[in-house]
Amino acid sequence: MAEPVQSLHPVDFSTHVLSLASTALIALGKMPAPDGEDLPLDLETAKHLIDVLGMLEQKTKGNLDESEQKLISSLTYDLRVAFVDAQKATSG
């Protein structure tokens, strides 16, 4: 009989938010992919992921504990700043 698949990380809101943020950072070229490869800048994907985080922040307002609210707020803000910086770097 096959062994059940075990999750690598806990399945909770903070882990999901961190996963989205990490993927956005990879798309922005701010961190390597999980295999260590440096991927090309992908502003479209980064913007989409940042927009998803912003939507989650709005839709979950009042339903998160303090640490979850601080996490999503700070990550969304930092990613928006990084996105603007990346846009400026590619247009100039």
Label the predicted regions.
Residues 60:
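Acidic, glycine-enriched active-site microenvironments
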